[in-house]
Structure formats: C-alpha cells, structure tokens
C-alpha cells in the first residue's frame, strides 16, 4: 500500500499549517481567558467570540468539515488523507472546533449524513455542518443503566 501523500493532501497540509500559525496558536490564550471568564460567570457552555471568529475564517478558506468522506458536505478525503491533517490540528486544544472537526460532532454528523432521513438532516445535520450547534451522544451497555 502506498502511504505517500497526494498533491491535494500536501496542499491541505500547507494550508492547515499556515492557518494554525496565523490564527489558531495566537488565539489559544484569548480562548482560555474567555472560557475562564465564562466559568467564573457560571455559564461555560456558550460560544466564545474568538472561536466564532476562527470558525468564520476557516470556513472562508474552505478548511471546514474536512473529516467528512464521500459526502457532498465535506472535503471527500479518505481516512488516510485526513490523518496528516489531524496530526496538525491536534497540536492545539482549540483547533478541532475551529475546523468543525471535533468530537462528538464529527461522528454524529457522519451518522446523520449516511443514515439520517432528509428531515433529520435538515433539522440537525445542516446546523452541525454550519457550526451553529453542538451535539452529544449517550450510550450504555445492557443490564448496566
């Protein structure tokens, strides 16, 4: 199996690295400060100004929903193509959300894209893809909960 990166992936690596250097790393301290302010105020579950700005910039550069394979909504990358981008994004605790590639949203979007009804996709997938809402999931094992 050939594990070398395609020209497309190398270009995306350069774009993601440049975005991280120009926008994400410099925003980390401000993000942490905003979150601390929200925690002290008793409501850490609200969007930060800096994260919304990062999302807007990532969308504008088409560095958005890179995780979605075989989909009209994503970059159409395979896992092998997406992995080196994850390595770059994984260098910052705020990057996955900035690129709309954070758990559990990614898995939930994949499930909705593949198996959701048109109504479910309209109600939940579209706002998740746009980064307007967040999602969750819960699971248990038989005879446990």
Give the residues covered by each predicted segment.
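Residue-level signal for inorganic ion chemistry
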Residues: 9, 20, 117
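Glycine-rich flavin
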Residues: 29-145
């Amino acid at each position: 199996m050939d594990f070398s990166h395609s020209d497309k992936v190398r270009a995306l690596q350069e774009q993601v690295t440049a975005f991280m250097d120009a926008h994400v790393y410099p925003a980390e301290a401000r993000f942490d400060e905003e979150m601390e302010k929200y925690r002290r105020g008793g409501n850490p579950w609200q969007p930060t100004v800096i994260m919304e700005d990062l999302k807007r910039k990532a969308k504008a550069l088409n560095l958005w929903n890179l995780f979605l394979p075989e989909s009209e909504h994503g970059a159409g990358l395979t896992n092998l193509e997406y992995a080196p981008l994850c390595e770059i994004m994984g260098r910052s605790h705020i990057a996955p959300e900035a690129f709309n590639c954070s758990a559990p949203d990614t898995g939930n979007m994949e499930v909705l894209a593949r198996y959701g009804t048109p109504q479910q996709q309209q109600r939940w997938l579209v706002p998740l893809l746009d980064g307007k809402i967040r999602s969750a999931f819960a699971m248990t094992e038989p005879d446990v909960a």
